[in-house]
Amino acid sequence: SRPFVVRMITDSLRWWCEAIGIDGFRFDLASALARRRGEIDGVSALIVAIVSDPVLRERKLIAEPWDVQGYALGAFPYPWREWNDQYRDVVRKFWLHGYTLKSGDMATRVSGSHDIFFYRGPNSSINFLTAHDGFTLADLTMYSEKHNEANAEGNRDGTNNNHSWNLGVEGPTDNQNILEQRLRLHKSLMASLVMSAGVPMLLMGDELGRTQAGSNNAYSLNPELNWDATENFGGGWALSWDKRENDLSDSIAALSSIRAKYLSEIIDEFFTGSIDQGTKRKDIAWFHRDGLEMGANSWQDNSLRYLAFMLDATHKQSLFVILNGDK
């Protein structure tokens, strides 16, 4: 918060923008920047200086809104965007069995997390399922437990709260039925991400089926390991273009096209369920598997793993999305 430190940081950021052409920044452990007198309030001297700067405020500003001392999701001012770990955890729990979850929680995250970003809009939420920390998408359905033995810390490092599901076999398998289920879950997770209101973030390599062999703390691996070493996931740090999962990659491309065609112009604001006087349709409507619209009591159901919603995408077309976590 000291003026000369704030000036040094903002001058450095502005130099990267003006001299190099950087169009945005992601701030690691950003809640440390928002802390004032020991409390996180989003109006620290540095945060105010960044959002007040005519150059920096026009760049993409993305916060990881937590650090070792605190959690600050939703505390950053416009135009900051924030990594939404609540989105990550809820969507994982919906698709990967064995976790308690109210159906309303999934609907809230898919429709933009209005409970967190009500005053700023859904585009303030960076929706993600995987990141550089934690499991890859492939490992979410291959491992129920972390495997960080190669880090030489007795597998104590890395979180134990992965919300993952191995479908009965820990690690790789030749069982074709399990392989098909895993691929279907990968597609379902990606469909939820791409079809949600908010800004979707994909971990590079997930679209290719990249694995870390169950490691959820790759940062601590020895960087001098041979690329082909077993401890280095058989080259998992690099993208295996020759072993890529074309089916998954093609599916993500198709989903992205659907988002661009139907959703790009209607997800800047939260869906409310209100009726458009021009189309006489709700901007979003939620349905049970029997086709009946969901009522208020439905949102407290802990066992419901099926959600369907219709978006009033255009005056001529609507988009109907089914999320079936039961099968």
Regions found by a protein language model. Give the residues of each.
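Carbohydrate-binding surface patches
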Residues: 286-327
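A short, structured beta-strand-centered segment in the mid-to-C-terminal lobe
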Residues: 3-6, 14, 236, 240-259
